[in-house]
């Protein structure tokens, strides 16, 4: 089963994303801090990480840098920060993709599919889920 880890300091966001992904048959886990997220990446070896940038303690940029020291897991940034400088700095820190909240669920799923295809994984979420027009809030 396809494993996705969401790391965001907002429990409502991680719960919403986890529910959205689980209702589509995916193995979704969550962490509400960068430190806990790194521990989970080591423990469960997710296929994709969805990561917020602005978090207390270890922020998303720091998480990207740390994860890149031990893993090539695709990292999708999902944040409210929309300036070109933020996008560039996240990609420079090791992120693979960047989306700005709010995002339609279909767009999120399409980006997850692209990341798995680029990673060359044998798993595909394309056939596991249906896409609808729901939009994830900020």
List each language-model region with its residue ranges.
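Conserved acidic segment of CheY-like receiver
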Residues: 1-12, 17-21, 49
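Active-site beta3 strand of CheY-like receiver
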Residues: 44-50
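Short, Lys/Arg-enriched segments at the junction into DNA-binding effector domains
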Residues: 3, 116-138
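Receiver (REC) domain active-site loop signature in two-component systems and cognate sites
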Residues: 55
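C-terminal output helix
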Residues: 85, 102-116
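Active-site residues of response regulator receiver
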Residues: 8, 52, 79
């Amino acid at each position: 089963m396809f494993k996705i880890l969401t790391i965001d300091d907002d429990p409502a966001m991680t719960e919403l994303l986890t529910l959205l992904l689980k209702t589509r048959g995916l193995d979704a886990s969550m962490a509400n801090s960068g430190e806990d997220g790194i521990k989970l990446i080591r423990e469960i070896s997710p296929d994709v990480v969805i990561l917020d940038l602005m978090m207390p303690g270890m922020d998303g940029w720091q998480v990207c840098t740390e994860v890149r020291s031990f893993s090539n897991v695709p990292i999708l940034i999902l944040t409210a920060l929309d300036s070109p400088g933020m996008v560039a700095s996240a990609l420079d820190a090791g992120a693979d993709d960047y989306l700005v909240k709010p995002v339609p669920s279909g767009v999120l799923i399409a980006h997850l599919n692209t990341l798995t295809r680029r990673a060359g994984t044998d798993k595909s979420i394309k056939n596991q889920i249906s896409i609808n027009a729901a939009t994830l809030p900020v």
